[in-house]
């Protein structure tokens, strides 16, 4: 199926799992381009309601009868072959395509595809670059893995040759993309339910980098040795960034109330001084990646400064949820040991008396494969509360639990408590937190509800 938006928008596309953050964005891109769209999901959500209001046919629950006059069925990697809609589509010889391949087709309609990859920081960097591209009036189409205030959601449909998207390495999805600019923020062990080991992961990132045409750009973190190794094996232009190394660097970094100010240098030339509204060294690196990408497109420095100066953070990325009785409540999507350390480092740089952390591990496979790394991630928390593991797509086989992780963390000298329900966690926090303390909820599941419940309870 060819996706020439000017010629083929009489087609009807059905999305299985249309309520997901990426699938809903793709559906909205098609709706804005005049396609007929239908889709199903297990439950109603704000995203499904939004799409319905834009004209999509939404079905709650998966049923083969939901496929009505459909030309193409798009599904996510999480959808099993036994899904009744996928079964029906194949029985009826309706073309099917997974989300990544479909996104690749959409990207082919644009000349300048900016695909942002890495184990951590994809959503924040995509959001930062989106701010820059809007300030520069590039009129981009944007697809981001979280809600971004400046576009009032997770998708923006532009009318230019610029397409900005996250590029996820899970199940090697990003190998179906067509990047003109490919960003690799970092390469670490994750998704070990799919990859054999870290070398397998690095080789997959190399394959992604080799998708970039010779006149395109690979933007890589010079402070990450695996990124550097990848950059030495490509034929396209390479721009490196970093705090300690790189073509584009941050120097003279100072923190004020958690917010970093630094000078941006390209080689030995000072370009400008920048203050970010988001805390932590990891956000400096994400900003440098965005700046490097913008410089490769010859975006004016003034637009770069304006874009990053108006960026106040992506949702669920060190997001300040509120303040009550002098207690600041923050939420962060971190679900990998490196991300957790970065979030807690940002918390330490934020004005506080004590840092209370509530962590909900995400998936059994990730918890067991990175068990020791998780256990060593919480030294910057004065008190840690562990919630039960968020299963997501997995089943509990009894191999690992939050209690087991808590025992290991306590061996490392961290004040750690295991509690099983959010209600019990909130009750504990109400009795412990005092004026000047900072509460940070961490995890990719629904642990953000703890912060919301605490604010409501107070």
From Swiss-Prot:
The keyword Protein biosynthesis does not apply. ATP binds at residues 118-124. It catalyses: UDP-N-acetyl-alpha-D-muramate + L-alanine + ATP = UDP-N-acetyl-alpha-D-muramoyl-L-alanine + ADP + phosphate + H(+). InterPro entries: Mur-like_cat_sf, Mur_ligase_C, Mur_ligase_C_dom_sf, Mur_ligase_cen, Mur_ligase_N, MurCDEF_pg_biosynth, UDP-N-AcMur_Ala_ligase_MurC. Pathway: Cell wall biogenesis; peptidoglycan biosynthesis. Its main location: cytoplasm. Gene3D superfamilies: Mur ligase, C-terminal domain, Mur-like, catalytic domain, NAD(P)-binding Rossmann-like Domain. Keywords: ATP-binding, Cell cycle, Cell division, Cell shape, Cell wall biogenesis/degradation, Cytoplasm, Ligase, Nucleotide-binding, Peptidoglycan synthesis. GO terms for biological process: cell division; cell wall organization; peptidoglycan biosynthetic process; regulation of cell shape. Its EC number is 6.3.2.8. GO terms for cellular component: cytoplasm. GO terms for molecular function: ATP binding; UDP-N-acetylmuramate-L-alanine ligase activity. It holds the Pfam family Mur_ligase. It is found in: Cytoplasm. Belongs to the MurCDEF family. NCBIfam families: murC. Cell wall formation. This is UDP-N-acetylmuramate--L-alanine ligase. The gene is murC.
